[in-house]
Structures are given as structure tokens and as C-alpha cells.
Amino acid sequence: MKSFKWKENTEEKDDEEKTNEKEQNKPKEIDSKTEQEAKQEKVSEADNSVKDQEGITNKNRPEDISYVDDSTIQAKTALTVEAITNIKGHLIESDQKLADERASQYLQTLTNNAVRYTTTFGISEISDEILIPYYHEIDFQGSDKELPSLFSFETFVNEYYGTDLLTYENEKFKTMMCDHPALSRSSEIFKVNAYKISIKWTGETFNPSIGDPSNIGTTSLIKNIAYVGVHNSDNYKDRKLYSRLKMFLELAANCNIILKGCATRPLGIDYELTKVSKKLNGAKILYNDKAHIIYNGIYHPVTPFCDKVNDILKEGDVDIDFGKIFKYGREVVTKINTYDILNKGYAAIDQFTAYLINMGMQRLLDHRMNANSYKDLTQANYPSRVSLHVFDTLLDEFLYVYKPTDQDWEFCLFVIMIDKEVRSLIMAKTKQMMLSRNLFGQSEIGLKLTNLITRRVQGNIAKNAADYFINVMSSGSIESLCNILCSEMYARFSKFNIECSYLETEYLDLFKFLEILLAFIITPRLAWWNSHKFGKHLYDLMSVFCRSELIAYEARYGCFIKFERSAWVKVDKHVSVYGENDLYDGIYFSFLISRTYSAEEIKAFPFISKIYSLIEPLGDYINLDRKTRAKYPFFETTVRGYLPCSIISYTDITTNNPVNTRVNNIGASIIDLSQRYFTHKPTKTSTKEAYDLILDTIGNTANNLGILMHSTVAPMLATLYDTFLFFADGFNKTSPWVVPRKLGYSGYNVYADRNKSDADRATYLIGGRAIVIPRNLDSTNSMIYTYIGIFVHGVVRCDMVTSTGSYITSSHYDPDSISIMPFNGSEITTLALKVVNHSKRINTVFTLFNYLHSKSTDEILSPVRERLSKFWTTSNARALLNEITRIFNCPIERYFTQMNAYDTMHSDPRVYKPTLYSVSSTGNIDSVQPANCAVNKQYEFGDTYLNEMLKVISHVAFDDELPLFRQTEGLVCGYFTSSSNSPDDYFSVDEDTLYFSIDLDEHPEVFTTVGTNGFSIQLQFKKGNDDHAYTNPMSKDIPSIKFLINRIGNLNAHFVQFINRMLSTQRHLIVLRKVVVDYNVITLGSWNDYTPTSSNVFDQFVKDRDLINIKLDFYDTRFIIQNQSNQLLSQYLFESYRNITPLKDFVVMGGIFGNPNRAESKLTDINKDIYCFGDDNDQTTKYFTSKKSKRVV
């Protein structure tokens, strides 16, 4: 792990070394370097040896790191972030002193009954718990819980034979079991009275739990269809396929498991040794290991069983060479000093689980976070004045931190763009960071301004003006400021609503001009990209204050224009119907477009001709180098952000700055407009003078805005732009009226195939359409801009208000040093890593859905896809996606739900390899896609590690050869009795000589109909030289017949009924050669456990002649003990069916019961196909569940 030391960047000198020509507007000289700064410089020199390096090697790394101030950081401590800044003298008071003792009484009295307006930032109140980790850690520290495994042992105990294990237990072995849970688990599994030990599915050891695919439920793979006729048997097949798909998905959701804290304990065996105990004496055993048969070779009460376990180790056994490949415990892979960081463990889990854990861990090791990468990620999330230095401490903190690849960050951007909740989480963090820095305060200007207006202006006008500013003050807050700045940062994702509440008298509506025009300075993106609303408010105001000028302007230039064929042309549209879609289609208010006016035009349109010069963008772009170095995602190809104005240091700022110049121009234009307006109105001279004074006062007071924007807002935004939190811009400084195209997402290559037929389009989403990404609903009142312009101060404040303007004096500095901590960049780094890991999990969900898509040609999930392809409808696709998202706990189905133009819900998830597109306002994909941003891009779905894991999971889920799927082909129906049965017993069709065979597929003519009144069924055939014909199926004269047929559906229903009546005589059989049987093997411990059934299985085929798949139970009687008087009589199995091939069973060992020293007669052989002793293919000790190659494909 690395520790990080923060210190202030000291490359820039203090301003005391410069000659200042404007002393009256400059702060007092800041004292020379403090002692702390001197110490920091020394630390900086010492840090150069490790800066920009992976870190000191373990060989040379000191245990402690000492700093020059004699403080010591222990090398074993986890990651710490220490931020030290000494930004001198700004903020006399914090925003918490809004209603301090000097103003609170009067101000509260004024604002108590004022109408309040709020600024909302439309983000959802959500927690980062919605972000699902890509890796799932299981910590075994201090716990004896077992390791996860798909399979484990299942013990069948003969309850009718009361042998107590403890009667024969060895006391020394019992003591050893207490220290080694794996030994006690093994003894518990291989009990004295266990008649059978088999393998069972244990998917519940995972989270989420993995269901047993052999349990076929009622849910079908195909939705909303009725199974009738020849397709009726498909219902069972679809339900079986669904159960396997469900298991596949649940296992895929558990691919990335990290096992932590797995301890080992050595075995100490100090009594009579066996072959196994000699090998294991002193061996380290995993404390959390599962049961293993080999432990019973140390000691077992049933001596023959213990001997049998030891016999597998006899010298010369080529299958198992214990001394070379049988391993226990763990091997150290990575070690730091005396600490084991990474180990390779050996445990008795199945090879599939071992493979998935190892492959997931291998990805983590191949892409493990290192100190330099983490430094780049974190450095981007701190202000530029804070420099980062890296020291080497324990690496285990980084050991489990995944380092995202470039492809991961690219897809992360895609998720951020389309997922409103993830965006809201990022936006909420941005707002939190803005508020946490304590950069803004609310000044007392409101109180002074209202007092000034009241003193200098008499009558109702003064009261109305004072009421206006009271409303402005009561509605604004520092949080409202941060809300509007957040909306500005994320304007591309904001559906913004600006309310403009007009006042009781038209004279006061002049203030609305100020509000609207200030918006283009403070939030240029919001103002320009919502110019259909801001322009509408300007239009309404001009309709009042310069109506004749506006009418003449419209007559010459039109109200709306559009750029077509290299020229601006008028658009005939009424203001009342102009909206957002028109703006996106390139239709703009003509007075918002830059144009060159002649002297005659300026004279004719004195106010309107100035509008663009009053709203023209003041700022510029900044390159986001730290973001680029950190590889954080950004939508545009050129990684830069637009600032609303330039950055001017708080030590250099004066009232003569670009923003103040713009504000003064706005004030002058409004004053000029008001003068011309009052010239044509019968207004008292005192009223006009009063308004001149008010406007003059506002104009001078608003000089505060330039200081706020240049020295606080712009630097803060520049810092945030470089962080992970800022991911898209798109503002066009030269043509600000151009709104970036809306964004949507659909299948990759929909753009290229948009001209295909509707049938082809259905394989994507909706042909050439896309789902438009959702936006946040933000709203405010235009008063917020007056509030920001007058009543908010930043790192430089100005509270002096006079009738001639405001001035900055030396008193604006706090004489004491105030330290403003940078916001916690480590929190942003943590959020970034959470988001990218969450997006990687979503990528996995899309990867699986892509494999199921009808357009996919991949081998993975092909059995399911082939079945689905015939029913690839919206409802089936949606049901599948819902199932995937439920299992992965990633509700991405919301990505495919949107409101269409008619406010109705639309949802179609049939998107293959989704990507972003630029789209029209209605969601149609643009015919030309921009090349300067991340649209029409093919993402990487999955990775090499995931694809390899999915191949193994496919083997588990869909390979019918696995013993997990107890499935056999062929079934014989009739009546059978037997006194014993085992899975190896079966009815041999070819070797049977008791029945006369009739192949109905080759000789369907044996059944005919006879008779004139109605008809009868007749069975006729030739046996030897004799002809046989029967119309009575119950006739005892019919020789015992064995019918053979592939599918009963090939026969007439009446013929099938005839055969069924023949079977009821218990003298005939029918062999269904192509029927697939899913079966369970029920092992009986006593005849009391067996209950014969009276049902006839063939009845199911009579009812459904197309039935080709059925589930049945078979019995194993090998381990029945009859040691009670009521069990001494002979017992038999009575069944209406038999298997025609041997059955499979997960039998590990059987017959461990009876007198412990006389159990040879019942002991079965140890199934070596179940076990693999070693770590072939880099896997752990395990038992196999397949007779295929022990090397996982």
C-alpha cells in the first residue's frame, strides 16, 4: 500500500516580490515563508527520490518513514491522505454567518413574509449502494465457514442400524479434529453408519445462490405462447432449458470471488501412523477447507474403510502419486517482509469453482492497481495547487484493487451517459464538493442596498424596489448557487426550466433584463442551450420596453432564422409555438445570432443591435491534462472544458475585469433603454430619476460579480473539470447558439443498417431509432442571477456599497491566516473506482444478453439462443433481460424504457452490442454522426478472462455428459418386479429373449381397423410360420410382445390405446427408444422407505402422444439392511418402467456401516473419477464431476 503526502505547490512566488501599481486595490503584503512552508520545501526535496516511481522496493523499504518535523508514519498503516494548504487571507466570514448579530433582526423581519423561489438541481436522492462491486470479497478471518463450492458430499445414514460414531472414536483424533474443521467435517461425512456418500449440488454456498439446474421448475424459457399439438412436449424442454440458463447466469454472477483470510494450521499426528498420516504429519491444512476422503486414512473407526483409503496410496499406483502431486494448505506467492500477501491455496473444492476463482484472481493480478496509477487517479481530483508525493507502505491495500483498463473507462462513460441514477450520484458528489470548500459567503449588501434605496428614493417605488431585493435575498442561498453551477456543469443532461416572475409594475420589470442577461455570463451553457426559454423572456420584455423597435426588427430580419445553404433564412413561426425541438433543429431567435450591423441599423435598433454583444461568451477553453493523464473518461475527443470567464488570481483581481466590464455595459444598455422608454411615457420626473438612481446603484453594486466569477467560480470549475466528475462539455464558443445534438443509444451498426427493411430492423431496437438518454429536471427563478450577481461573495469580498459604486480596499483581507482545505479528492477517486467497477458488471450483463441475441454467432449460450431465435420477441427479450438483471442486481431494464412523443411508455430491449448515437429530438439516428465524440463506437463486451470462464460455465450448464444431469435415452414401459436394483441394472433390449419383438417404425401395418358398423382395432403379425390376428387386447392367446418405436406420436391414437390395454395384462412391453428421461436415483436404506406407486407411466404417453421428455425416479436397493423383525420377509420393487441403459450416480463410497471391523462385505470401491489428487492445469485439489479429461477445456 502507498501512503500519500500532500503539500502546497511552492513553485509560484508570493506577490510581495512584485511591484504593484494599484496599491489601493491590493491586499496587504503577505508575510514571507512561514516555518511550516520551509518544512514543506525540505520534505519536497526529500520526496524527489520516490516521486513518479512504483515505490521503494521491499528490500530497501524502511519500516518507518520519518519526516523533518520528527513525526513518524508507520509503514504498516493503510492509505492516508494528508492535505496541507496555506491560502492566505480570504473570507472574513463563512457562509454560516449569513444572519449574524449585526443584520439578522432587521433582515429576518424583512424576509419573513417574502415570496420565496427555489433553485432545484434535479438529481435523485440515491446512495452509492446502487453501485455493485465487480469483485465480491469473502473474508474468512476468524471464521470456520467452509469455502464455496458447487459440489459437496452428501451422506445417507442408515437410521435402522443404530451405530454411534462416538462409540468407536479415537480420543487423540477427536482432539485433532477440534483444531482442524476439515478433519471433523470429513469424519462427519464418512460416518460409521453411512451406507452411501454421494455428491450433491451446493450452489447455496455462493451469493447470489446458484440453483440446481437439475431441478426443473414451472418457468418456461419462452413466454406468452401456448403449447398444443406436436409442440406440447416442448413445454418440458423449455422449462428444463430455462433451469439451466438460470444456473448459468447465477454462476456467471459469481465469477469474481476473492478469498481473504484463509488460515492454515499444521497437522501434528503423534500416534500409530498409517500411510496417509505419515504423508500428512506436519502438513498445513486450510482451516476453512471442506471434507475430503483422504483424511479418513489417518483414522476411521471402520478399519476396512481406513485401510481402503490407505490402499489408494500404494507404491506404483500410476493414477495417484501422493508424494509428488497431492497438496494441502497454501504456497506463498507474494511476501513483504514477514507478511504473506498472496497465497496459492489447495482445497477440496470442485474444479469448476477453483477455475473460476483462479481466473478471476488472475485478472486482478494482471490488472492490479499500483501506486503511480493511483496517484494519477487521485491527483486529478485535487486542486492544482496541491501536489502529491508517494511513499511505499504495505501493498496489500492495493492487492485487491482492480486497475481499470482503457476499455473499462470507455464503457464506464457509456454507462454514465445512459444511466440517470449513476449520473445523479456523480452530480451529487459535485455539489457536495462545491459546498465543502467553503468558497462562498452571503454578504450584507442586501441590508445596505435596501437601506440605501429607502433613503435616496421616496414613495411606493422605493418600497417596491426594496421588496424586490428582499425577495431576491430570501429566495437565494449558497446551496442555490451550487445548484445552478452544477446545472451549468451538466447542462447537456439538464432539462432546464427558467421562471421569470414579472413584477407588479412594469417599471420594475427592467430588473428582469438584468436577470436574463446575467444568466449568459454566469451560466453560459444553460442560457444558450435553453435559448428558446431565455430568448422568449427577452422577447416578452422587449415587447414592453421597445415594442416599435422589435416590430421593425422582425420586419427586417424575422423573429426566427435558420442556417440553410450557407445563409441565414427567415423561418415563419410564432413565438407561442417555438420550443426545444425547434432549437435542436437549428431554428433560433434572430436577435441572439451574431451579425454585423451598419450605422443606420444601429440607429434603428439601438437596443436589439447590442444584445449579442451583451451575451457573447466571455470565457475560454482549458485543457484537462490531469484528467487525460488519469485516463478518466470524457465524451469529446478533445479533452477540454469551457469556463464562463478567465481565471484571475485573488491577489491580482481588481474591479476592472472582463465580467465587470460586461455588467457595466448591461447596466448602461438597460439605463439607455429605460430613458428612451420613459421619454414616451407620461411619467413624473421624480419617478424617472428614482429609476436612474436604482439602476445606477445596481450597476455599480454588480461589480461584485466580476470578482466572484474570475477569482472563485472559474478556478473552482477548472478544478472540478479536471476531476472524474466532469465527463462531457460540447459548448461552442464561436457559435454558442448551436446546441449539441441529443444523444441516444441503440444497437451497434443500426446506423449503417438504418435503410434495411423493417424485418431486419427488428433485430436491433427500432431500425433507425434510438432511446434518447434521460435528462435531469432542473428549475430556477431568474432572480437567482441577481442574487448571485449582488449578494454572493467568494474568496475576495466587497461589502462597501455607495451611490457611486463599490471599491476594494485593503480591509477586504482577513488579518489572520485562514486555511481553506481542498475538497476530499480521495472521495472522488473512490467514487470513480466504484463507478467503473459497477459499469464493468453492467458490461457483463450486456455481454450475456449479446450472446442470447439472435444476431450472435458465438458458441457460448448457443443452445438457448437457437431455441429463442424462433421466438425473439419484445416480451421474451424483456423477460430474459429482467432475469439477468435480477440475478446480477443491476436493474438495466430501465435503460430500455422511455416516454415517446405521445407520453406513452415504450420498451424494447432487443439491442445488440449497444452504443451511443447523436439523434434528433424525436430519437431518429442522425444520418451523419459526429467524429469528435464517443458516438457510433463499438465497445468491448467482456474480456478474455470472462470469455474463458463462460466456456467453463457452459460446460457445467449444458453438457449432458456431466453426471450432474442424470439423463438417459430410452425407456421401456410394462410391469416389472425385482428384489434388488442398482443404477447399473437395466433392461437389455437386444439381449432379451422372453418377448417377441415388433418394430412399429418398420412395420406400422401390424395395426389395422376392421368392421363395418363402426370399427375395431386389429393386431396382426407373423411369428415363425404362424399368422396371428387379435382384436381383443386382453386376450391371453397373444404371445408376450415387445413393441419398439422411436416416438409414440407416430401411431394413431386408437392404436396407442390398444397397446396400453395390452400392457395392463402385465404380459407385454413397449420400448420408447427416443424418449429422453431425466431421472433421480433414490437410495433406499430400508424397505420401509419404499412406497410402490399404482400409476402407469405409459398413461402419460397415451395422454400426450408427442411426449419425448419425462422425469422419473429409479431406486437403488444395494444398501438395504434388514435387521428388524418386520423386515425379514422378502421385499420387491414394483414399477411400470425400466431404463434400457445403465444410469449414472454421484457415488463416492458406500457401505460404511455394520460392525466397524467387519464391513468388507458392504464397502464399495472408491470412485477415483470423483477425485483428482493434485493441481493439474493450475487448479487446486478437487473432485471431478465428469469423466472427460481432467484438464478443463
UniProtKB/Swiss-Prot annotation:
Amino acid composition bias (Basic and acidic residues), ranges on this chain: 1-10, 19-64
GO cellular component terms listed in the entry, alphabetical order: T=2 icosahedral viral capsid; viral inner capsid
Entry keywords, A to Z: Capsid protein, Inner capsid protein, T=2 icosahedral capsid protein, Virion
Membrane-traversing stretches: none
Main location: virion
Stretch forming the signal peptide: none
Coiled coil: none
Region annotated Disordered, chain positions: 1-64
Subcellular location: Virion
Family, as annotated: Belongs to the turreted BTV-fold inner capsid family.
Subunit structure: Homodecamer; each decamer is made up of two conformers of VP2, called VP2A and VP2B. 12 homodecamers assemble to form an icosahedral capsid.
Additional information: Function inferred by structural homology with BTV-fold inner capsid family.
Function: Inner capsid protein that self-assembles to form an icosahedral capsid with a T=2 symmetry, which consists of 120 copies of VP2, with channels at each of its five-fold vertices. This capsid constitutes the innermost concentric layer of the viral mature particle.
Designated name of the protein: Inner capsid protein S2
